[in-house]
């Protein structure tokens, strides 16, 4: 029987499956953070249970951590309590924790891959919707709720229904200046934010293969934003080169055996998908969102659509509401729109390649008057590498704020947030109402586009900006 990559991964992890029941699957790696885990550990404690396989669970602090200090209380009392509880729970149950002062601390979806905790063929879960990031390695990775976090801690398994299969092929090569963020935003613009509902998506095509692992993580990170359960990219030599010699990656003969297995993790020729979507890479422009979901997106040189031109009444009403919230008229270009803040970071775009791309724009320039610009590395190791390369100095000299690792302004759960009415060019993954702060207006862009907006005070076409 011909199988897709998703089917191979799912079938390899089924522990129990009976007619009329949701399959029970084994979980290879469980990533934990401070927000969705406290009640799960409390549940174990109440029932007198242990963590079944502590070595397969790794925790870090990310959502609530302040990025302007390493003070546990720096983001408020609730954040402090959650981080203190995580430290207490991981110590009691024997789980590895990268706390706020550890060099490996960082956003969970940055920390996992850079430590080699994310490997092809694995099932990976976390109490966070952007767990799909790890699918870039050919792992079946998806977010779970707190009750499921407890179930995985107790049993190393979770109930999971089979999803429909979707293939998204990006044909050909992208043009100069087009990034992974532009690719995935263009995909969501085509599918809409609900186009992948009920599916696991496999991304493929020459443009996807050409991406680095960091670019592939950006693409899979946002699979959830088109409604999918998870995103996948088949592992290849790019994957293996990234993983080799990572701390938790196999070594010696185990590495050779692992690679031999990983090479089988691809969709069989002739395997069938329920849904197929294709894009031409050469047609993708630098992308900017204009509304309140990632599907509200256009190329930088396009005009904001007129809701009156939308045939679907629900789509039309959604667009009207989005434009009212964003304080924008239809039929203008986003190059006419000034911004107040810039956020370069998040589990989508806070890795070293992202910071290099932003620094190439910032070098020798200054942040525009009246604009606050934050650069927040995704982990302690990313920050350390950036400082070795002198990127921090480039940002600081240009007027950007160089911060400590954390989720930061991606979500309003710490001190980095927008004030009502403020407009932000952000490299994060969600532009929902209030996502970055009550009344805040978020535009999703690539790191280079965000840096260009910071120095020009408005959105510009990155292809017209000289890079240093």
From Swiss-Prot:
<feature type="binding site">
    <location>
        <position position="407"/>
    </location>
    <ligand>
        <name>[4Fe-4S] cluster</name>
    </ligand>
</feature>
<dbReference type="Pfam" id="PF00330">
    <property type="entry name" value="Aconitase"/>
</dbReference>
<keyword id="KW-0028">Amino-acid biosynthesis</keyword>
<keyword id="KW-0004">4Fe-4S</keyword>
<dbReference type="GO" id="GO:0003861">
    <property type="term" value="F:3-isopropylmalate dehydratase activity"/>
</dbReference>
<protein>
    <recommendedName>
        <fullName>3-isopropylmalate dehydratase large subunit</fullName>
        <ecNumber>4.2.1.33</ecNumber>
    </recommendedName>
</protein>
<dbReference type="InterPro" id="IPR036008">
    <property type="entry name" value="Aconitase_4Fe-4S_dom"/>
</dbReference>
<dbReference type="GO" id="GO:0051539">
    <property type="term" value="F:4 iron, 4 sulfur cluster binding"/>
</dbReference>
<dbReference type="GO" id="GO:0009098">
    <property type="term" value="P:L-leucine biosynthetic process"/>
</dbReference>
<comment type="function">
    <text>Catalyzes the isomerization between 2-isopropylmalate and 3-isopropylmalate, via the formation of 2-isopropylmaleate.</text>
</comment>
<dbReference type="InterPro" id="IPR033941">
    <property type="entry name" value="IPMI_cat"/>
</dbReference>
<feature type="binding site">
    <location>
        <position position="410"/>
    </location>
    <ligand>
        <name>[4Fe-4S] cluster</name>
    </ligand>
</feature>
<keyword id="KW-0411">Iron-sulfur</keyword>
<keyword id="KW-0456">Lyase</keyword>
<keyword id="KW-0100">Branched-chain amino acid biosynthesis</keyword>
<dbReference type="InterPro" id="IPR018136">
    <property type="entry name" value="Aconitase_4Fe-4S_BS"/>
</dbReference>
<feature type="binding site">
    <location>
        <position position="347"/>
    </location>
    <ligand>
        <name>[4Fe-4S] cluster</name>
    </ligand>
</feature>
<keyword id="KW-0479">Metal-binding</keyword>
<dbReference type="GO" id="GO:0046872">
    <property type="term" value="F:metal ion binding"/>
</dbReference>
<dbReference type="InterPro" id="IPR004430">
    <property type="entry name" value="3-IsopropMal_deHydase_lsu"/>
</dbReference>
<comment type="similarity">
    <text>Belongs to the aconitase/IPM isomerase family. LeuC type 1 subfamily.</text>
</comment>
<dbReference type="InterPro" id="IPR015931">
    <property type="entry name" value="Acnase/IPM_dHydase_lsu_aba_1/3"/>
</dbReference>
<comment type="subunit">
    <text>Heterodimer of LeuC and LeuD.</text>
</comment>
<keyword id="KW-0432">Leucine biosynthesis</keyword>
<dbReference type="InterPro" id="IPR050067">
    <property type="entry name" value="IPM_dehydratase_rel_enz"/>
</dbReference>
<dbReference type="InterPro" id="IPR001030">
    <property type="entry name" value="Acoase/IPM_deHydtase_lsu_aba"/>
</dbReference>
<comment type="pathway">
    <text>Amino-acid biosynthesis; L-leucine biosynthesis; L-leucine from 3-methyl-2-oxobutanoate: step 2/4.</text>
</comment>
<keyword id="KW-0408">Iron</keyword>
């Amino acid at each position: 029987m011909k199988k897709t990559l998703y089917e191979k991964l799912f079938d390899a992890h089924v522990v129990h499956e009976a007619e009329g029941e949701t399959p029970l699957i084994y979980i290879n790696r469980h990533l934990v953070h401070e927000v969705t885990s406290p009640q799960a550990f409390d549940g174990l404690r109440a029932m007198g249970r242990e963590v079944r396989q502590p070595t397969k669970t790794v925790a870090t602090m990310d959502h609530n951590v302040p990025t302007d200090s390493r003070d546990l209380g720096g983001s408020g009392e609730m954040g402090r309590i959650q981080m203190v509880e995580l430290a207490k729970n991981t110590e009691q149950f024997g789980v590895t924790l990268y706390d706020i002062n550890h060099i490996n601390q960082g956003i969970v979806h940055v920390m996992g891959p850079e430590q080699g905790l994310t490997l092809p063929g694995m099932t990976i879960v976390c109490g966070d919707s952007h767990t799909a990031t790890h699918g870039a390695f050919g792992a079946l990775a998806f977010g779970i709720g707190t009750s499921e976090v407890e179930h995985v801690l107790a049993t190393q398994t979770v109930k999971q229904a089979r999803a429909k299969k979707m293939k998204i092929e990006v044909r050909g090569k992208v043009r100069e200046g087009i990034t992974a963020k532009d690719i995935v935003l263009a995909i969501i613009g085509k599918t809409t934010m609900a186009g992948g509902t009920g599916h696991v998506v496999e991304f493929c095509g020459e443009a996807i293969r050409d991406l680095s692992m960091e670019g592939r993580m950006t693409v899979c990170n946002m699979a959830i934003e088109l409604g999918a359960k998870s995103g996948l990219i088949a592992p290849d030599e790019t994957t293996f080169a990234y993983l080799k010699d990572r701390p938790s990656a196999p070594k010696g003969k185990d590495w050779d055996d692992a690679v031999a297995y990983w090479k089988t993790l691809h969709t069989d020729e002739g395997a069938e998908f329920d849904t197929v979507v294709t894009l031409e890479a050469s047609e993708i422009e630098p992308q900017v969102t204009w509304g309140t979901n990632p599907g509200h997106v256009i190329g930088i040189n396009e005009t904001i659509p007129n809701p009156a031109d939308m045939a679907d009444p629900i789509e039309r009403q959604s667009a009207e509401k989005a434009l009212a919230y964003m304080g924008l008229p239809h039929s203008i270009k986003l190059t006419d729109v000034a911004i107040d803040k810039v956020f370069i970071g998040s589990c989508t775009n806070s890795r070293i390649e992202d910071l290099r791309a932003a620094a190439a724009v910032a070098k020798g320039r200054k942040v525009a008057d009246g604009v606050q610009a934050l650069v927040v590395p995704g982990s302690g190791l990313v920050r350390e590498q950036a400082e070795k390369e002198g990127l921090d100095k480039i940002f600081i000299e240009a007027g950007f704020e160089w911060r400590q690792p954390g989720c930061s302004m991606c979500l309003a759960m710490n001190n980095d947030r927008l004030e009502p009415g403020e407009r932000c060019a952000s490299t994060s993954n969600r532009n929902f109402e209030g996502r970055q702060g009550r009344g805040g207006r978020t535009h999703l862009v690539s790191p280079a586009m965000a840096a260009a907006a910071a120095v020009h005070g408005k959105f510009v076409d990155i292809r017209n900006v000289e890079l240093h």
